[in-house]
Amino acid sequence: MCEQKYRWTKKQIRQQLAVVRGEMAPTLVLKNATYLNSVRGKWLDANIWIYQDRIVYVGQDMPAKLDDETEVVDCGQQVIVPGYIEHHAHPFQLYNPHSFANYAAAMGTTTLINDNLMFFLALEKKKALSMIESLDELPSSMYWWCRYDPQTEMNDEEGHFLNSKIKEWLEHPLVVQGGELTSWPKVITGDDGILHWMQETRRLRKPIEGHFPGASEKTLTQMSLLGVTSDHEAMTGEEVIRRLDLGYMTSLRHSSIRSDLAKILREMKELGIDDFSRCMLTTDGSPPSFYEQGIMDRLIKIALDEGIPPKDAYGMATYYVARYYGLDYELGMIAPGRIAHLNFLDNVFNPVPTSVLAKGQWVVRDGQRYGSDSVFPWEDFGMKRLTIDWDLSVDELHFSMPMGIELVNSVILKPYQVSVEASRDTLAEDHDECFFLLLDKHGKWKIPTMIKGFAKKVSGLASSFSTTGDIILIGKCIQDMIVAFNALKQQGGGIVLVENGEVISNIPLEIMGLLSSKPMEEVMEEEKKFVKALRERGYEHDDPIYSLLFFSSTHLPYIRVTQRGIYDVHKKTVLFPSIMR
């Protein structure tokens, strides 16, 4: 059911009480269960009664009343832990929130706390809030953030980030935090508009997540005074301690571009950390193929392998998370009153579940998945196929700018002096400089420049997958870039790679040109084929999907290609403005 004002109605609560009193039968009984008591940090034995989607009893008794509808499961050979929580999900990395939630639940991650940015920008408020309510009808629990900024420079930022819109998002019961705050430099230097929204968030007793890579003690201190309560950008044990000492809830990340959780945990232990109750685990919204090896189960296993006590390894993905968000009254522990999210394990040191309950429903039973073929009605919420109703000609592709952008790793861009003759239609493959063009998705403006460090042999690439949904063209051959653009138009958005006038790899993104409508497993295969083709043509960094997403993202150094033009992040100025077509 959708969480509106109350999760359970008065009638439902009365029925739950009747089960405890023996007047009604539970729907599911887990007898002889060894479970993690998260509050005590102990493994205890009990019988667990569930009525529909709620745990109603945990103790030594069996129900006084059972009927033909009651399922009784002997759990004597297993251990049970709470369903895992991913508190920092970006559910739009080619996949969509529905497909990701279904896939995650099958691996034991039954609660997602999601970034709202893409839907905040792409949908009008009423449709977006109706969409998140409909998504909460899944077996998974789906919660959301409220962004304060677009993490880029937009032509119509004020039209998106309105007081009334932010206020309604913040007040929604499925929205449990503000952030992540990527425009923190603006707040420190005087942006009272964002500070007002932060104050509103704290007034509503909701936490605020920051985005503070490499931040000093003074910066972290100031952000704490401004109301920020957590951060996920610690990259060393020392940076974790700096945040903990300043009172932050601190996320420990293991993602496609920062896969160093084991190193961070080792450094924390070497520095004397033995209390992990103010830490949480996150995969930070990685692309599809990263999740082949698991989601929160994978991170818990890394923690266990590094000698973290089981109560903490599981706690950082369950109880500690729920407690921080003020959701421990219904999530994160196995106790009466909580939603029936439960993972069944063969043993304590293998967090990959053999069976999973989500809201009291079996989504996995003895390794068999159930209910993963459901379809979500995206078009009902205005999320339709991308339509590009304008054309692009070879004559428009002129690259005379003296300064280009250099991709130094998956996500960092630096300025560089263009060293090749860019007036030609085709560039040589003995260097890594390519043509680069950002195009308004409505065809109104363009930003032509050069990119170094992306690849040596990419002939033509087109992508509508970007922070703002605007269109990226990259390549050595202008004619193949045009072919890629036209193929992108025809397939309704996504990513297209062209060589010698032919499409050699593509990822269709049928939902607004940003998200795939396919199951996670299919998107994984499409992504792997695309990445393989790109690597064969000289892409050498960790994650090309993040590269495409972050070309416009001003929360990262040093320069970005935004709707307003090429933007200097440090100086907060437009170096070269966009050109009207």
UniProtKB/Swiss-Prot annotation:
SUPFAM superfamilies referenced in this protein's UniProt entry, alphabetically: Composite domain of metallo-dependent hydrolases, Metallo-dependent hydrolases
Gene3D superfamilies hit by this protein: Metal-dependent hydrolases, Urease, subunit C, domain 1
The enzyme's E.C. designation: 3.5.4.2
GO molecular-function term, one example from the UniProt record: adenine deaminase activity
Keywords in alphabetical order: Hydrolase
The keyword Hydrolase is annotated on this UniProt entry: yes
Record flagged with keyword Metal-binding: no
Highest taxon, organism lineage: Bacteria
Reaction catalyzed: adenine + H2O + H(+) = hypoxanthine + NH4(+)
Cross-referenced CDD domains: AdeC
InterPro entries: Adenine_deam, Adenine_deam_C, Amidohydro-rel, Metal-dep_hydrolase_composite, Metal_Hydrolase
Pfam families for the chain: Adenine_deam_C, Amidohydro_1
BP GO terms, sorted: adenine catabolic process
Family: Belongs to the metallo-dependent hydrolases superfamily. Adenine deaminase family.
Stated name of the protein: Putative adenine deaminase BH0637
